[in-house]
Regions:
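Residue-level signal for inorganic ion chemistry
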Residues: 12, 48, 70, 92, ...
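Short, well-ordered beta-strand elements within core beta-sheets of diverse protein domains
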Residues: 15-21, 36-42, 130, 238-240, ...
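Short loop/turn microsegments at loop-to-beta-strand junctions
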Residues: 1-4, 268, 389
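N-terminal Rossmann-like NAD(P)+-binding subdomain of aldehyde/semialdehyde dehydrogenases
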Residues: 1-117, 495-508, 517-532
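Conserved C-terminal structural/oligomerization subdomain of aldehyde/semialdehyde dehydrogenase
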Residues: 8-17, 343-536
Length: 536
């Protein structure tokens, strides 16, 4: 049986291992979760929320345990681990408060079809397969699992093999809530286990991962028409305009590029600075990079603010992109040194869009900075990407900042900051173009785990019901007249049936009949309304 080693990227030490799931485990898990779905979907929402709040309580009580595992598993500081937990519980807290509103049945206006009542209601899909990444292995799995459960689904979770210790931790936390654990199954393993989960015919697949993996799953799910939603890679641009607070742009831009060692899907991956402030920005951003303290500490009182890359594959990508850029004429103005998985925060200039560094996702602490003539050139270059996750715009002229923000082909724009839009729990987050089609955060996150169903409720059709009249043969003229009267755009269009009726002998009896029916209908409606009011 395959095992997944837990490796601390800062020290290279192995600190445990997990058993990978077998093909039989995958089949059984999906079968079990399909049965469990019949129980969970019938639980009233308030009971589901009670169970999920117990998990929220367990997470808060287990804070030190979680940050310790994240620290060993990814090399990030305990404080950065705390940020993951904080973002998770903030989201869960908001979702549980708002879910009764988001998930409730809603009446739909009847339009012309007044003799029935109509409503729509979000229903769960069934078994949701959640496939997670390693860069924020807690925050990018736990809230997704909880949202799917909140909506009434059961879940099969396949956490990343790179951070398998966090996957085991997530499994253990869920097991501590007996009310919840029968409705989630965690399957550990690498891409093969993920592929088997997708092939196992779940009712919905949710991936957070690379665009390359998204493409593979899109192909696999197309065969079975399984719905597939994905949060994928990014190449987020930052634009610094002439009216920017350059010191703030340098400080928070550097933070956005180097936070989590650059392994953040909406981290700053490319910077475009207008020529008027380019030299000043470069001077200040280098000064900011000099302040970054690299290192690893187990203690919560650590002095470092940047750890190692999380695993070897990331190092290879960073090295390959740097070599390609340098060979094509780029210049490192700060950093560039590599020691094990520790990569210095690196600022690189003279970059062009034919370099991999400006086109492909890097996911490392590398900040390429490019001088541009003006806002127009910055926008053109920022949009010259297959990705479209987030972007950052810097200007103290809010009209200009908003104008640029609205012309960026991305899912979210942050004006005068970086990354900080992500922790806002009710602000939808997700990509356009090849950055994916999912939305996390808020109502949109929870509702994407539901399918909207519609209901038309009433007694058998009445003779004067429009739906009955339109089904009768020889009612073409009548139907056309009703359409014009009801939906005519101009007064002339609306009045046309009346004019035609007055001129058309054939139509007169029909109009008379409709007028009588309308009279009866009005009386029935008036009686029904009076009865309803009397009952109230
Ligand atoms: P990855 O694509 O390598 O792996 C993601 C998950 O998919 C892992 O669990 C992996 O085992 C699984 N997987 C791989 N191949 C599979 C297959 N054929 N079928 C089913 N499952 C398969 O991504 P990663 O390296 O773990 O994560 C980093 C990537 O995720 C980056 O591209 C990053 O931008 C992206 N990401 C996006 C967001 C977002 O919200 N848009 C957030 C975080 C990370």
């Amino acid at each position: 049986m395959e095992t997944l080693p837990f490796i601390n990227p800062a020290t290279g030490e192995k600190f445990g291992e997990a058993q990978a799931a077998t093909a039989e485990d995958v089949t059984r898990a999906i079968k079990d979760m399909r049965q469990a779905f019949q129980v969970w979907r019938r639980r009233p929402l308030k009971d589901r929320i009670v169970a999920l709040r117990q998990l929220q309580e367990v997470i808060i009580d287990s804070l030190d345990e979680i940050t310790a595992v994240l620290n060993q598993d990814t090399g990030k500081s305990r404080q950065d681990g705390l940020i993951e937990v904080m973002m998770t519980v903030d989201r869960l807290h908001q979702y549980y408060r708002h879910a009764p509103d988001w998930l409730q049945r809603r009446r739909v206006p009847p339009g012309l079809y007044v003799f029935k009542s109509y409503y729509k209601e979000p229903h769960p899909y069934g078994v949701v397969a959640v496939i997670g990444p390693w860069n924020y292995p807690f925050d990018l799995t736990m809230p997704i699992v909880c949202s799917a459960l909140l909506a009434g689904n059961t879940v099969v979770l396949k956490p990343s093999e790179v951070t398998a210790a966090t996957g085991v931790l997530v499994e253990n936390l869920i097991k501590r809530v007996p009310e919840l654990s029968p409705f989630v199954r965690v399957l550990h393993g690498g891409p093969a286990v993920g592929a088997a989960v997708v092939q196992g015919n779940p009712d919905l697949v949710f991936l957070t991962g690379s665009t390359a993996t998204g493409r593979k799953i899109a192909k696999a799910t197309a065969e079975t028409m399984t719905p597939f939603i994905a949060e994928l890679g990014g190449k987020d641009p930052m634009i610094v305009l002439e009216n920017a607070d350059v010191a703030a742009a340098a400080k928070w831009g550097a933070w956005g590029a180097f936070y989590n060692t650059g392994q953040t899907c909406m981290g700053i991956e490319r910077v475009y600075v207008v020529e008027a402030v380019y030299d000043e920005f470069l001077r200040q951003v280098v000064a900011e990079a000099e302040q970054v303290r690299q290192g690893y500490a187990v203690d919560i009182h650590n002095e470092n603010n940047m750890g190692p890359l999380t695993f070897e594959r990331q190092l290879q990508i960073v090295q390959e992109q740097l070599e390609d850029a340098l060979a094509k004429g780029a210049r490192i103005v700060y950093g560039g040194k590599i020691d094990g998985l520790f990569v210095e925060p690196t600022i690189i200039v003279d970059v062009t869009h034919d370099m991999k560094l400006m086109q492909e996702e890097t996911f490392g602490p590398i900040m390429p900075v490019m001088k541009v003539k003006d806002e127009t050139e910055a926008l053109w270059l920022a949009n010259d990407s297959v990705y479209g996750l987030s972007a950052s715009v810097w200007s103290n002229n809010m009209r200009q900042a908003k104008r640029v923000a609205h012309r960026l082909d991305v899912g979210s724009v942050n004006v005068n900051d970086a990354i900080s839009h992500y922790p806002v729990s009710l602000l939808p987050f997700g990509g356009v173009k090849q950055s994916g089609n999912a939305r996390t955060h808020g109502k949109e996150e929870v509702l994407q785990f539901t399918q909207l169903r519609s209901y038309a409720i009433g007694r058998p059709p009445l003779p004067f019901d429009l739906a009955t009249q339109m089904r009768e043969p020889n009612h073409y003229k009548l139907g056309a007249a009703i359409m014009r009267l009801s939906f005519g755009v101009t007064l002339q269009q609306r009045l046309q049936p009346i004019k035609e009726a007055l001129a058309d002998k054939e139509l007169r009896p029909e109009i008379g009949r409709m007028a009588r029916l309308a009279g009866v209908a009005t009386a029935v409606i008036a009686f029904a309304v009076a009865l309803f009011r009397a009952k109230k």
